[in-house]
Amino acid sequence: MTEQVQANETETPVAVADERIIRETGIDAKVAGIVEPVINTLGFRLVRVRLSGLNGQTLQIMAERPDGTMTVDDCELVSRTVAPVLDVEDPISGKYHLEISSPGIDRPLVRKSDFSDWAGHIAKVETSIVHEGRKKFRGRIVVGEADSVTIESDQISYGNEPVVRIPFDLISDARLVLTDDLIRDALRKDKALREGRIPGDDLGAEPEDAASTETQEKK
């Protein structure tokens, strides 16, 4: 069993107003339901849960601070806190490795605010049903609205509309595409955030592409 770590009293639980619009299914959804309240209490937001067959079984929990940052120390705090909860709830059969990570630069887009925050950058979007004759889209995020996002294709192909409005409730998966512009913008945002922080804050670390803890074997 992993030692339980209590949230620091100075941490502010995350508000639930900006809930995820893309959610897990199956065992991933079960795990998300267990860990999301714990992660929120620590002052972080859950991005994604994914159980894969990597190294036997690997449970990846992706999280971030409300400002989009996540350091190795943050990942370790989340790991130490959720591990004992998972031990008690025991949602996964067999042994598995627990990995806590940041979203990285080419991050998944799981909230409405993610689309507006990264407007102007290229994303890949998949829908749960056929929309405008297809289920896969790629293009620049033009604007994120209350109930939809508009994508302008950067690779126009015959028969496909160059600009498509996609309702959020149809999106099953979405993530940013790694480009030079995205890297520059991500580093610029990270620098601005660090300069605005109180000196000594543990978030004043080097920008992280994908900060993560070492995986720990469970059971």
Curated annotation (Swiss-Prot):
Keywords associated with the record: Cytoplasm, Ribosome biogenesis
Name the UniProt record assigns to this protein: Ribosome maturation factor RimP
Record function comment: Required for maturation of 30S ribosomal subunits.
Coiled coil: none
Region (Disordered): 195-219
Organism encoding this protein: Brucella canis (strain ATCC 23365 / NCTC 10854 / RM-666)
Compartmental location: Cytoplasm
Family: Belongs to the RimP family.
Gene: rimP
Disulphide-bridged cysteine pairs: none
Family matches, as HAMAP family: RimP (MF_01077)
Domain of life: Bacteria
Gene3D superfamilies: RimP-like superfamily, N-terminal (3.30.300.70)
CDD domains to which the protein is assigned, alphabetical: YlxS_C (cd01734)
Pfam family, one: RimP_N
